[in-house]
From Swiss-Prot:
Protein name: Signal-induced proliferation-associated 1-like protein 2
Region (Disordered): 1-29, 44-72, 362-405, 1068-1246, 1331-1360
Biased composition (Basic and acidic residues): 384-403, 1195-1218
Organism: Mus musculus (Mouse)
Gene Ontology biological-process entries: presynaptic signal transduction; regulation of small GTPase mediated signal transduction
Source organism superkingdom: Eukaryota
Length: 1722
């Protein structure tokens, strides 16, 4: 009791008083109000002196504590002492209570007068401290009195609200549950609607003192007296702290954290006169109490509340002690376990009940602002049941200033208007200065296949669950869900384990579960290890969950024995702060595990209720919205999109407090499910309407209690602001505004306004986009509201409620479910069988913990490149994730899959980790601990496939060349043997991550090349390839999950697969073409085992696709390398569109057939299938001229195994496309000509190096060049590039390129490459979709350096067909089965499927693209396949139509294209297709009747027929519309000279896809299905074109048309495509005349439209989709009619049967009568 300083409470009171001086009238009014309340509740407790008008009460300013004795309340403390449960260490409260009873309200004045009279000197400190303590304790007493007053019976906690969040689990008798009455106002806390749930967070802690002061702040001083004082006199505070009124105001506003005897400014520096006094001693001196009081105390004092925090702060200030962190060797199970802090648990233990009732949710925004004086703060409006705590609301929050036409900036709320994405701290193009997008949130990010930071939860992912785990992050990710809560259920429940409960003196009630399990460590062949799984729970909401290897625990017992270690030693090591002595073994009752499940899973809820308010034009207020009696058509349309209307009466699923028995809450409501969640919407217009009640309480009682509310605005509605809403429960508003309602162009804008303490949540709203009405938008919105609800539960209000509930559960367990047994120290586990007598002994190893499956944690400092700052973080590395949690915000700021880590550069105290495409994370250890970095590197070696980087200084040769090619991804595609680069150690497949200290991830390909060309000294940091020569790639590159996954509706038909947004820019790769490409399908390097995804990977792995034409620039400036585009993972939903390769792990972009489209396939799950697919897809027969190139490498191997016959090198195929535009220059860089035959050579069959694999596919545009003199590849001579309208991306044009024949060597590579490329190019076309017809040929140009010459011919082949059409055939690995519906459903229209590139979901039967495996691969097999496909039975897939349709055989096509081209011969020589081609089955594209050019004739290719397809089986085919797979694949052609050249073309992009290949056959002209809805004029044009087949141009045109038709058929053809097709018709010469040098122009022509192409395509697709939907509707109607007829027929049949029976009976009777009559007569 010796603290000589003024108490915090005094200062607080004074500060408030100062604020009040300005407005005496208001003060009096308020005081009267409070006095009345006070008297009402406490009977005689409040003396008349409470009236502020009585100046005598002031105590004359100088009065001391003796100033008057207040009447003691007879029903006050004394009457209720018996109610206060005794609690140890509680003496202080009683002391205060007694003090309170002995003094009057005037004691408040005494405090003021003491200070006013200058009693601040040392001499007066003792009494002053006494006053302080009395004062504080008195306050507690008041709080207790209120809580335990007779009003307690009104405790409304159980009826507080209809919300699911109600704390009904809390025992009403709980001493902490004292919120029945608000101590500040004396009013019952139960409120109406929204306010019902505001939790009055006022407990028995010292905070009540300040709350009381606010309630009676003026009563104790006489305004006349105080008015005469100058503020300086009035506040003679220590000048070091608050020498001015400003400081006083700060104190009153709570900006100083107050603890008696201490001051913290901003929680930082210790301020106070007794700072010199040891922190602990100060606290100790203040807590002296008598034992009597201690026994009667109900709660610990304020000082004890802060005791631990104070110690902590002292430690930080004086000794720099780090915050608590778990043992390094403990492997955390999930993110929240890493955030577990036992210090916080101790610090908050006594403050669980110390919660002030504050205004929350929308009510905080709508509160009436109060004039602010010098020391002012917010006051609650009179009559409010909530007291606005000035400390909680220091300055009125002004909001974030973000407004638009949907939502206005609002105090206490934060708005999301678009463009807000996940925080990015790594160095990548997105946050580099050169990033042009300027948007932190792109389409891709909103549909990212990556787990968002807030979506990361469980870090320990079992090997067998990894593919499934990855599947879960597809599409929109559910965030802020503690999935780790299932830890106990998964690892303890139903298994032998031990539970211990107890009440720790520092931590309060605790519960520990521990289990010893045997863990097989695949890395340790010599034996198994034991693992201890631990779950440690305190009153904090975070739980310590994880495991520790037995070898990592120091113990007196031997490790690895059957007996195990003493549990006591394990617990003492893991949680040294826990008092083991307090623990008792849990009772052997089935209730114990059940209670623990409830406790752990308390925060999990998969049922949410969402309010929907309807805002008409001109409206904005709550009342107006509630009073809209009925819904308008726009709102009805929106509701129909969002969910299904259900009849409430008898409804058995989640009803969200709606009446399902008597219809008292309306007859119908809106219900839906999303993922694992059930959502019931409280729709304002479906709830009961009361004409005489403007407040519409029947509606508001539901919607006002919903945490998340959707505000639907019609056009013309005023911007929404939470200020207009009165509810403490509504924390998040999702505003949806409709545009063009009830039209075909209906679309929606979305905005969000969330309470400031609700953390941000996804999916992010892309900037400047509107969402077309689609399933994608529905999923986006549902994910948004689910995440909003989950995030809101992290706000202070709900956390406080959950914490109280949790504490009650724990207390119950510790008191009622324990035995007397303590923690066993004998190390005997009853569940360990004695049978295993052999004592496995695993010696304790150093760094044993680094082999743990869970997340090992280190304290690091990370560089935030987004904000150019260093942040302290916790680094966690598990077997699945690497993540960073910022210490200050406790938020995950970075996460990536361990499979995405490709390498690292480690220093003594820092490490730079590279992941995915070379993005980099820079970390340094805290306190320069080099041991941490060593451990981190070791851990990375164990859990990732990366390696240490190598720095090289490269020299130039005499020509200034560096001697290698690099593609757009930074992967070395070719190295000149024995050149300087080769001697320095650079090898094919190496990945450049830094060039001259600049991160490659931040550079475009052009910038990369410029750096390499212009730097005098070229220093590069490279990541070496895998042992098999394949480049290191992130799993997300190889197995990118499609941005938009196919979503199947309930009927199994895919919902529209369309981009969810409407935007002018192309959706595909939005910001950075280069990047996307990367992800694109580069094959997975590395061994199959590499990733779980592996199989997929492997496929992908097959090729390193060269950037393949990544070089080429689309008109919009983006580079669309086919491969990139097609497979780039980032292509947004549509981005990869057909390509989707992105999807596949295979990641092999171009060639790999693998690219499974199916998102599913992407996941490993598909892997096996994919592999099969690939294998199947591979053209076994195809002869890869050389050993199969690495492209396939892994798959190739498979394929080869399957079809040993593959002779042509797959890489060729893959190259084809690339080469076309590969930069000729690239060759320059190489300078060596070796590359020319590198194809065969480098990619020898065994060679993983397949250029494709390597990514050799050169970036088109010579990007491959080391940058030396690469010139962007342009089409060389253009043979007559075919512009496929659809851009069938006729790769074949590539063939033309060859025609160039300019480089024979090129040709060599090309043929195969061309093919593969093409197919894949078309896939790419998706990228092309952006409008560039995409010179596919560029792709081919990639030819590994050899092509460097970039034979012009290759370029020409660019057939600009927009790649988009996408070759993306997808073959599902499923292999035997047809993709569902692929074949059968016309709807898919392969075109559509292919096109889904754009992200459409197919509306009808098309199988989900995800399934399709890679069809793209064709390009890989591409040429072969294509050719073979052509040959293959066109009809294989089954549609005669498609057969008919199929395109010319490749040979013919080639001949037509370049009848005399020597290249052809060369190509042929290379492929020697016929001979080599084995009759493997070609991939069939499933023929849908619609596909126009499905394969035409088997042609000589029959042999190739055995393309993968067949192997794959129809189901593999993703899109059935096209001809059989084989058609999909580039057909193989005989080496016939002309044919050979064609080989690489990929024919049409999706539309024609395989058809294209078939198209070659001049004999048959494909006829589209009449139902296809083709434009006959186009058909006629096509026919004419056919007639002119002999001319290459015509042929090109024809192909064009065909592809165009195909697209149309697919009905996915975009408008631009159509237009393009028309243009082509108009100017056939257009496609052919492109100048060889105009490769770019070539692209551009088609491409010029590219900027708008995507939008056009999207619109077109939407139109098509609508048509399909209309057709579907009609079909359904017809079906209904037919069903009705059937019903009638059944009824007629029954009637006839009845009549027949009746007639029979009558006949029988007649017969009987007749015979009986005769008998009688007889």
């Amino acid at each position: 009791m010796s603290d000589p300083r003024p108490s915090q409470a005094e200062k607080h009171k004074l500060g408030r008083a100062a604020a009040k001086l300005k407005d005496p009238s208001r003060t009096m009014q308020a005081d009267d109000y409070f006095a009345r309340k006070f008297k009402a509740i406490n009977g005689s407790m409040g003396p008349a002196t409470l009236n502020t008008s009585s100046s005598s009460e002031g105590g004359g300013g100088g009065g001391g504590p003796a100033n008057g004795t207040p009447a003691v309340p007879k029903m006050g403390v004394r009457a209720r002492v018996s109610e206060w449960p005794p609690k140890k260490d509680c003496s202080k409260d009683l002391a205060c209570k007694t003090l309170w009873e002995s003094r009057s309200q005037s004691s408040y004045e005494s405090v003021t007068s003491i200070i006013q009279n200058g009693q601040n000197d040392q001499g007066d400190r003792q009494p002053e401290e006494q006053l302080d303590l009395d004062f504080v304790e008195a306050k507690y007493t008041i709080g207790d009195i209120f809580v335990h007053s007779p009003q307690r019976g009104l405790h409304p906690i159980r009826q507080r609200s209809n919300s699911d969040i109600t704390i009904s689990d809390i025992d009403t008798e709980d001493v902490l549950d004292q919120h029945a009455v608000n101590p500040n106002t004396g009013a019952a806390l139960h409120r109406e609607y929204g306010s019902t749930s505001s939790i009055d967070r006022q407990g028995l802690s010292g905070e009540n003192v300040f709350a009381m002061l606010r309630g009676y702040r003026i009563e104790s001083y006489d305004p006349k007296v105080t008015g005469s004082f100058g503020f300086p006199d009035f506040f003679p505070c220590d000048t070091a702290i608050s020498p001015s009124l400003h400081a006083a105001a700060q104190i009153s506003r709570g900006e100083f954290v107050r603890i008696s005897g201490l001051d913290y400014m901003d929680g930082g520096l210790l301020m106070g006169r007794d700072r010199d006094k040891p922190f602990k001693r100060r606290l100790k001196s203040e807590s002296v109490e008598t034992s009597l009081f201690r026994k009667l105390r109900a709660v610990k004092s304020e000082h004890e509340t802060f005791k631990f925090t104070s110690d902590l702060e002292e430690g930080r200030l004086d000794r720099g002690i780090r915050p608590w962190s778990c043992q390094r060797c403990f492997a955390h199970y999930d993110v929240q376990s890493i955030l577990f802090n036992i210090n916080e648990a101790m610090a908050t233990r006594a403050s669980v009940g110390k919660r002030k009732n504050i205004t929350t949710g929308a009510s905080a925004a709508s509160q009436t602002p109060v004039p602010v004086g010098p020391a002012g703060g917010c006051e609650s409006p009179l009559g409010s049941k909530e007291d606005l705590n000035s400390k909680e609301n220091p300055d009125a929050d002004e909001g974030d200033g973000k407004s638009n036409d949907l939502v206005l900036s609002c105090p206490y709320f934060r708005n999301e208007t678009g463009g807000e994405g996940d925080r990015r701290i790594a160095l990548s193009r997105a946050n580099s200065a050169s990033f042009s997008s300027g948007e932190s949130c792109s389409f891709e990010s909103s549909l990212s296949s990556h787990c968002t930071n807030a979506g990361v939860s469980v870090l320990e992912v079992p090997r067998e669950s990894q593919p499934i785990h990855r599947e879960k992050v597809k599409r929109y990710i559910i965030e802020h869900v503690d999935l780790g809560a299932y830890y106990y259920r998964k690892f303890f429940y139903g298994k032998e384990h031990q539970n211990y409960f107890g009440i720790d003196e520092n931590l309060g009630p605790v519960a520990v579960s521990i289990r010893r399990e045997k863990v097989e460590d695949p890395r340790e062949k010599e034996g198994s290890q034991f693992n201890y799984r631990v779950a440690f729970r305190t009153s904090e909401l975070t739980t310590l969950r994880g495991a520790i290897l037995e070898d990592a625990v120091p113990s007196t017992a031997r490790h690895g024995t059957a007996r195990g270690l003493p549990l006591k030693e394990v617990l003492e090591y893991v949680i040294p702060e826990l008092s083991i002595q307090c623990l008792r073994q849990a009772a052997n009752s089935p209730k114990v595990p059940e209670q623990l499940l409830k406790l752990d899973e308390q925060g999990l809820s998969f049922q949410h209720k969402i309010g929907i308010l309807y805002c008409r034009a001109g409206q904005s207020t709550e009342e107006e919205m509630y009073n809209n009696e009925t819904a308008g058509p726009a709102f009805e349309e929106f509701l129909d999109l969002l969910g299904q209307r259900v009849r409430l009466k008898g409804f058995s699923k989640y009803r969200a407090q709606l009446d399902n028995k008597t219809d008292s809450t309306g007859t119908h409501s809106l219900y839906t499910t999303y993922k694992d969640f059930e959502l019931m919407f409280h729709v304002s217009t479906l709830l009961p309407y009361m004409p005489n009640n403007r407040q519409q309480l029947l509606r508001k009682r539901h919607i006002g209690n919903d945490i998340v509310t959707i505000v639907f605005q019609e056009p013309g509605a005023l911007p929404f602001t939470p200020k207009n809403i009165r509810s403490h429960f509504q924390h998040v508003f999702v505003i949806v505004k409709v545009h063009n309602p009830c039209t075909e162009n209906v679309c929606y804008s979305v905005g969000v306004s969330r309470s400031k303490d609700v953390p941000p949540f996804g999916p992010p709203i892309p900037k400047g986009v509107t969402f077309p009405k689609s399933a994608v938008f529905r999923d986006f919105l549902l994910a948004k509201v689910i995440n909003a609800e989950n995030a809101a539960h992290k706000s202070e209000k709900f956390r406080a409620m959950a914490t109280r509930t949790r504490q009650e559960y724990l207390k119950d367990l510790a008191e009622n479910f324990v035995t007397t047994a303590t923690v066993d120290t004998s190390a005997k586990f009853s569940f360990i069988t004695l049978g295993a007598k052999k004592k496995e002994r695993v010696k304790p190893r150093k760094d044993a913990h680094l082999f743990s499956i869970g997340a090992i944690m280190w304290h690091v400092v990370a560089r935030d490149f987004g904000q150019s700052a260093d942040i302290e973080c916790l680094l966690g590395i598990s077997n699945e994730f690497i993540m960073l949690i910022e210490k200050d915000s406790k938020n995950v700021v970075f996460n990536c899959s361990c499979r995405d880590v490709i390498g690292w550069t480690s220093g003594l105290v820092s490490i730079k980790a590279f992941y995915e495409r070379g993005e980099c994370l820079l970390l340094s250890s805290v306190d320069n601990r080099s041991e941490d970095i060593r451990e981190i590197v070791q851990r990375l070696l164990i859990v990732t496939r990366g390696c240490e980087t190598v720095e090289m200084t490269l020299r130039r040769n005499g020509l200034g060349q560096l001697g290698f090619h690099v593609n757009f991804e930074g992967i070395v595609a070719d190295v000149e043997p024995f050149g300087f680069a080769w001697k320095a150690g650079l090898r094919q497949g190496s990945r450049l991550v830094e060039i001259c200290k600049v991160a490659v991830a931040t550079l475009t390909h052009e910038q990369m090349i410029d750096l390499l060309r212009t730097s005098v000294t070229v220093k590069v940091v490279i990541i070496q390839p895998h042992e098999d020569g394949s480049p290191r790639r992130g799993c997300s590159e190889l197995c990118r999950i499609p941005m938009v996954e196919y979503k199947l509706d309930s009927e199994g038909t895919p919902c529209e697969y369309k981009t969810p947004f409407r935007r002018n820019t192309t959706w595909h790769r939005v910001p950075t073409p280069a990047l996307q490409p990367v992800s694109r399908a580069s094959p997975v390097p590395g061994t199959p085992d590499r990733l779980q995804c592996q199989p997929l990977l492997q496929q992908a792995q097959a090729a390193i696709p060269r950037s393949t034409s990544f070089d080429r620039k689309l008109p919009d400036g983006t580079r669309s390398s086919p491969s990139n585009q097609s497979s780039s993972s980032d292509p947004g939903p549509g981005g990869s569109g057909p390509w989707r390769p992105q999807v596949g792990y295979d990641g092999c972009p171009s060639p790999l057939l693998l690219e499974h489209q199916g998102p599913g396939s992407v996941e490993c799950d598909g892997t096996g299938e994919q592999e099969d697919l690939l294998e199947g897809g591979r053209l076994p027969e195809t002869k890869w001229h050389g050993p199969p190139s690495k492209v396939l490498s892994s798959y190739k191997e498979r394929v080869l195994q399957k079809d040993g016959s593959c002779k042509e090198s797959p890489n060729k195929l893959s190259h084809i496309g690339d080469k076309s535009c590969s930069s000729h220059s690239s060759s320059n860089t190489l300078s060596s000509n070796t590359s020319s035959n590198s194809d065969d050579k480098h990619f020898g069959s065994g060679d993983l190096m397949d250029p494709e694999l390597l990514g050799l596919t050169y970036i088109k545009g010579a990007s491959t060049d080391s940058g030396i003199d690469t010139t962007p590849c342009m089409p060389a001579t253009i043979l007559g590039p075919v512009h496929l309208t659809g851009s069938r991306s006729l790769m074949h044009s590539r063939a033309e390129q060859w025609a160039d024949a300019a480089d024979v060597s090129v040709a060599d590579d090309d043929p195969a490459k061309m093919y593969a490329l093409h197919g894949y190019a078309s896939a790419i076309s998706s990228s092309a979709a952006d409008g560039s017809m995409g010179d596919l040929s560029e792709v081919s140009s990639h030819s590994s350096g050899s092509q460097h010459s970039g034979s012009p011919s290759a370029h020409c082949s660019k057939s600009t067909g927009s790649l988009d059409s996408s070759k993306v055939y997808i073959v599902t690995h499923g292999g035997g089965q047809q993709a569902p519906g692929a074949v059968t459903k016309p709807y898919h229209r392969q075109g559509a499927a292919n096109k889904y590139v754009i992200g459409w979901k197919k509306s009808e039967g098309s199988p989900p693209p995800e399934e399709p495996e890679v069809t793209e691969c064709p390009r890989i097999y591409g040429e072969m396949d294509i050719m073979s496909t052509a040959t293959q039975h066109p009809a294989v897939v089954g549609d005669s139509v498609s057969e008919t349709q199929h395109v010319l055989s490749k040979d013919d096509f080639l001949k037509l294209m370049l009848p005399d081209s020597p290249l052809v011969e060369e190509g042929r020589r290379k492929f020697s297709f016929y001979g080599n081609v084995s009759p493997r089955r070609s991939l069939y594209r499933t023929l849908s009747d619609e596909s126009v050019c499905s394969n035409r004739r088997g042609s000589s290719f029959a042999s190739s027929r055995s393309s993968i397809l067949e192997q794959a089986l129809p189901n593999d085919i993703l899109f059935s519309t096209t001809p059989p797979y084989h058609s999909t694949l580039p057909p193989r052609t005989h080496p016939a000279p002309s044919m050979g050249s064609l080989r690489n073309e990929f024919w049409f992009s999706d539309g024609s896809l395989s058809d294209k290949s078939k198209c070659a056959d001049p004999g048959l002209m494909p006829l589209p299905d009449t139902a296809a809805g083709l434009d006959w004029s186009h058909l006629v044009d096509a026919a004419r074109a056919f007639e002119g087949l002999d001319s290459d141009e015509e042929l090109g045109l024809l192909c064009h048309h065909a592809s165009y038709l195909d697209q149309r058929v697919a009905s996915f053809c975009t408008l631009t495509d159509l237009q393009h097709g028309q243009e082509l018709e108009g100017a056939p010469e257009l496609s052919l005349c492109v100048d060889p040098t105009s490769g770019k122009e070539f692209m551009d022509t088609p491409g010029e439209r590219s900027p708008s192409t995507l939008t056009g395509k999207v619109n077109q697709l939407e139109l098509i989709l609508r048509q399909l939907q209309t057709d579907l509707r009609k079909e359904k109607q017809d079906k209904a009619v037919l069903q009705a007829e059937v019903q009638h027929l059944r009824q007629d049949n029954m009637r006839l049967q009845e009549e027949s029976q009746t007639a029979t009976a009558q006949l029988r009777k007649f017969t009987e009568w007749f015979f009986s009559t005769i008998d009688k007569k007889a």
